[in-house]
Amino acid sequence: NIIPHEEHILDTQLTKRFFGFIDSFVVLSKKVENELLSFVPGAKYKYSPHPVYNIFKNTLSKEQAKAELKIATKKVLLFFGLIRKYKGLDILINAMEKINTELEDYTLLIVGECYENKDKYIDLIKKAGITDNVHCHYSFVPDNEVGKYFSASDVVVLPYKTASQSGIVQIAYHFDTPVIVSNVGGLPEIVDEGKTGYCVEPSSNAFAKAIKAFYEKDNISELNSNISDYKSQFSWNAMVNAIEELVNV
């Protein structure tokens, strides 16, 4: 990020000062590219999208992963990663409340270390009446356990209120798992609409409608296959080449 998600009064001043010591930049999204040029109009940089993570094991079938997590429901949705205010977990909880009775037979996995008071989310879940459908793991997940959460899931949901880019989408793509994301920041840049996922407004109504439509379309296997092809463009070699080009200029 150029500017932190939770902004501070000194961010702009400190960023400008810090960038004065930088020779060149690699930006991972067009949003960050625009932010960089607003600070350093003549910046020397390369644009290279966030690569797909390839460090996670992908050895479990959906059935095996669900068994390990003790999930018996047919539908599984995943919210994964650090839980901070800008991640919009409240949006997702409120969305699930709206479609709770319609969706049926589902589990929402909330997995990630909470950088806020988790009690507020526990209270939201209770008030939404979806406690029985939500499995929470409010702590860091080591690399060797990441796979079971993604392998068990039909879709990864990112209801972010702001975003530069997302490593979570690229983990989802590693497991050929589709995504539903907010149309903010750099997130739409890495989603092929209707083929690898869906982009919607960051509101509970929009996410409720998108999640309901996702399951009504019943084309998860097609999305999985699309992602398998689409993700090849997000390679680590491309980023290495971008860095080498900067260094060799």
Question: Where are the regions a protein language model picked out?
Answer:
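Glycosyltransferase donor-sugar binding loop
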Residues: V52, F80, T107-Y121, S139
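Donor nucleotide-sugar binding/catalytic pocket of nucleotide-sugar-dependent glycosyltransferases
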Residues: G20-T59
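A short helix/loop element that forms part of the nucleotide-sugar donor recognition site in Leloir-type
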Residues: K57-I71
